[in-house]
Design a protein with these regions (language model features):
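Short, low-complexity N-terminal intrinsically disordered segments enriched in polar/charged residues
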Residues: 1-33
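Short beta-strand segments enriched in hydrophobic/aromatic residues
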Residues: 19, 31, 86-88, 124-127
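A solvent-exposed, acidic/Ser-Thr-rich amphipathic alpha-helical stretch
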Residues: 24-88
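Short beta-strand or tight-loop elements
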Residues: 62-65, 103-107
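Short, solvent-exposed loop/turn segments that connect beta-strands within catalytic domains
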Residues: 74-78, 94-98, 115-119
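Short beta-strand edge/turn micro-motifs at domain boundaries
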Residues: 81, 104-135
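Short, cysteine-centered beta-strand-loop-beta hairpins and adjacent loop/turn segments enriched
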Residues: 89-100, 130-131
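Flexible, surface-exposed loop regions and adjacent strand-edge segments
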Residues: 138-140
Length: 140
């Protein structure tokens, strides 16, 4: 049987893959209906906010590591917290194909176990270092 920690780490990889493949429907499925993240509230608003930044940018790669997972948050077996390092590279597209933007940071996620498995209920990303041109990120 797969541990809850491993299931959460697998979901984190699913989020990164959805971001990089621009799988908007798949990304939405990884959040609860009322989730907060990326400065938005609600699953649909979160996906729309991400689309505003990644929809028109070229290839991206979200590399994740140094996972720290705290299960049974506040004694609740259906709540968890994860802290995950990320190194993210974005390349430009179209008339911005010569641009790039890279950042290092840490995701802080709160998780809820649902009938469909673990889902993100809250997501924050703290950027500790960045370089390049943020204009690389643009709507599609």
């Amino acid at each position: 049987m797969t541990s809850d920690r491993d299931l959460i780490i697998e979901r984190l990889a699913d989020v990164a893959a959805a971001l990089d493949s621009r799988d908007w429907a798949g990304l939405g499925e990884l959040f609860t209906e009322s989730a907060t993240g990326y400065g938005a509230t609600g699953r649909e608003a979160i996906v729309e906010r991400v689309r505003e930044h990644l929809g028109g940018c070229g290839p991206s790669q979200h590399l994740l590591g140094n996972h720290r997972v705290q299960l049974a948050l506040h004694g609740d077996e259906d709540r968890a917290r994860s802290l995950t390092y990320a190194r993210v590279l974005h390349l430009g597209a179209g008339d911005r194909s010569d641009l790039s933007y890279e950042c290092f940071g840490e995701y802080s996620d709160l998780w809820t176990r649902t009938p469909d498995g673990w889902r993100i209920d809250s997501r924050r990303f703290h950027i500790s270092f960045d370089r390049g041109d943020f204009r690389t990120l643009q709507p599609g």
